Amino acid sequence: MLKRFTVSIFVLAAFVSLAVAADENQNVCKGDPDKWQQIFNGKDLTGWKHVGPGGDTVEDGLIRTHGGMGLLYWTAGKIGNCMIHVVYKMRDENDNSGVFIRIPIEPREEWMPVHYGFEVQIDNHPEKSDEDEYHSTGMLYSLTKPLAKAWKPGPEWNTMEITLDGSRTIVMLNGVKVTDYKDGDPVPDRKFDFEPQHGPRPNFGYMGLQNHSDNDIVFFKEVAIKPLKK
């Protein structure tokens, strides 16, 4: 996460109002709850859009991040009451990225999702950036402490599954629960201005993949969603 803050605090109230008004009619995650819907086709970035510096390409069937900090988001609409399946690896052991969820409106720049959505962090060694375990892989960035440390070394494939169940967010990493959070749970004080604003997030929001910097190369092999069983 780059260490700067450019979003006005006054905008937060507007986004929270949007979050409160969200309902199931906005949810585009529909279909068979027993079948994953692949939203990355393995060939190109159809259905995705990039905002902010840097970008993403598809190489050998994988999304590859370039430069940053920016965000590649899925344009189909908001999702909630669903599961998100992501398979990724890092080029090196300590590369940085994240899976963004609960983004209240369609992004037009890179910082709104940071402050008003949630980032499920990808960073195996936050201590190398003078950050603590609240900033490690599988955490809601700066908000949750790991229930377990289940990441594989950076160049190995990792499987992340994120459950959005109302306001509750559960993160499974390689089959191990590492995060279980719902609105209202206690969170630590903000230490840096680049950390997200505190407060509720929408039950239904956009999702995206972060490209962090020139030195942080992450590859995504699968991105899929399916609705929760009712």
Give the location of each predicted region:
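Bacterial N-terminal signal peptides
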Residues: S8-S17
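Positively charged n-region of N-terminal signal peptides that target proteins for export
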Residues: M1-R4
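General helical structural elements
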Residues: V7-S8, E106
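Carbohydrate-interacting regions of secretory-pathway proteins
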Residues: V20-K230
